[in-house]
């Protein structure tokens, strides 16, 4: 009897394992070698690419019948070089258009599966939407979303940010029409899931600083902020830009004095702006880093300039340990840290439109307010 029971238990375990395997979600990221090969496949399957290929048929006939090859050559070069650009633009627009027509289904999937900002929570949404869009002929392949991150990004740019920026009900109805109640429900579910993730991050996943006594701020190491800045930008990664800058200086020598001063000057200012904002790729890409930054600000007991110095010191160590930055010199000092928070976080609360190349981080708005209030309250208590 016992042997039969053991056999039955083993058979049940095998069946359950097979059921789990059959229920395993297969995404395009599991089928393609990389996002680039997936992207090339989607372009190949698009209508715009086929039209571009068909354009070569009349061009080849024109080449054969024309006595003057100059005009066919010019048109062929235009089709060759401008054609791929138009194909990419049209594919991007058709992708947004296809999803905008299925916002209700998109929001229903989010409401049913309750994903948070964790990419793994979006895998079910990706699988369901890929199948739905293909079966309803809204997209010509089963690979609309490459992975969970791609789906979450589209949710932010298509639903979360545009809807959150609308100030009143009339503006929302005008832009989203019948999708408004579904979007509101989906956003409420998403906000609830993100709040749970925030609380879980505080209790289990947050980083605790250890051995900060030996951590020095760059202001204590370098003679000035200029030397720290120059050390950061004179790297192998910036070599192409510096070569372009030197080329700009050489070329401008053949022009008038005003142009020789203006051209290199503007180019150098552009480089300074670029390097000043290059840190955004380290801190603003991963949600985990942004949450840790806000949590560090909220939990800091020290007030005023000393408090921001401590926050800068902790974040310098954190980003170095997480390999998000190559050294412990991400922030120069507390003033630099406060500027970064004000420029890339607090300013989002009053944003009227999406910022260029930067996410609005709508789900972080309550915690950004909390971080700002915590610094203001500590400064008031000190007074």
Curated annotation (Swiss-Prot):
Q: Which residues lie on this side of the membrane: Cytoplasmic?
A: 1-42, 94-232, 276-383
* InterPro entries in alphabetical order: DUP/COS (IPR001142)
The Gene Ontology biological process terms listed for this entry are: protein transport to vacuole involved in ubiquitin-dependent protein catabolic process via the multivesicular body sorting pathway
- Topology check: give the Extracellular ranges: 64-72, 254
Keyword flag Phosphoprotein: no
Localisation? Membrane
State the membrane topology.
Answer: Multi-pass membrane protein
Q: Which family does it belong to?
A: Belongs to the DUP/COS family.
Query: What is the designated name of this protein?
Result: Protein COS7
Q: Origin organism of this chain? A: Saccharomyces cerevisiae (strain ATCC 204508 / S288c)
């Amino acid at each position: 009897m016992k042997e039969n029971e053991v056999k039955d238990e083993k058979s049940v375990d095998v069946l359950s394992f097979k059921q789990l395997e059959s229920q395993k979600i297969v995404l395009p990221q599991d089928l393609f070698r990389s996002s680039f090969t997936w992207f090339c496949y989607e372009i190949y399957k698009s209508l715009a690419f086929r039209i571009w290929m068909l354009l070569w048929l009349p061009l080849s006939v024109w080449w054969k019948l024309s006595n003057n090859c100059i005009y066919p050559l010019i048109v062929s070069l235009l089709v060759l070089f401008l054609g791929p650009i138009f194909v990419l633009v049209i594919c991007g627009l058709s992708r947004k258009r296809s999803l905008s027509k299925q916002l209700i289904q998109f929001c229903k999937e989010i409401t049913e599966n309750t994903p948070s900002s964790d990419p793994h929570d979006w895998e079910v949404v990706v699988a369901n939407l890929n199948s739905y869009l293909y079966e309803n002929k809204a997209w010509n392949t089963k690979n609309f979303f490459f992975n969970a991150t791609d789906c979450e990004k589209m949710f932010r740019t298509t639903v979360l940010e545009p809807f959150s920026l609308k100030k009143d009900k009339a503006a929302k109805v005008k832009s989203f029409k019948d999708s408004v109640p579904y979007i509101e429900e989906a956003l409420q579910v998403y906000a609830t899931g993100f709040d749970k993730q925030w609380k879980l991050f505080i209790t289990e996943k947050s980083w605790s600083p250890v051995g900060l006594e030996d951590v020095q701020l760059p202001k204590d190491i370098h003679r000035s902020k200029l030397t720290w800045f120059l050390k950061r930008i004179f790297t192998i990664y910036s070599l192409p830009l510096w070569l372009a800058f030197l080329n700009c200086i050489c070329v401008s020598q053949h022009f008038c004095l005003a142009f020789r001063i203006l051209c290199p000057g503007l180019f150098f200012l552009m480089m300074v702006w670029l390097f000043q904002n290059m840190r955004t790729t380290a801190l603003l890409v991963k949600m985990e880093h942004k949450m840790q930054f806000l949590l560090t600000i909220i939990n800091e007991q020290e007030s005023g300039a000393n408090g921001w110095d401590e926050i800068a010191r902790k974040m310098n160590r954190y980003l170095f340990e997480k390999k998000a930055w190559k050294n412990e010199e991400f922030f120069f000092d507390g003033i630099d840290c406060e500027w970064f928070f004000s420029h890339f976080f607090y300013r989002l609360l009053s944003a009227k439109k999406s910022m260029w190349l930067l996410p609005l981080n709508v789900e972080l708005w309550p915690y950004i307010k909390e971080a700002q209030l915590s610094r203001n309250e500590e400064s008031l208590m000190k007074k």
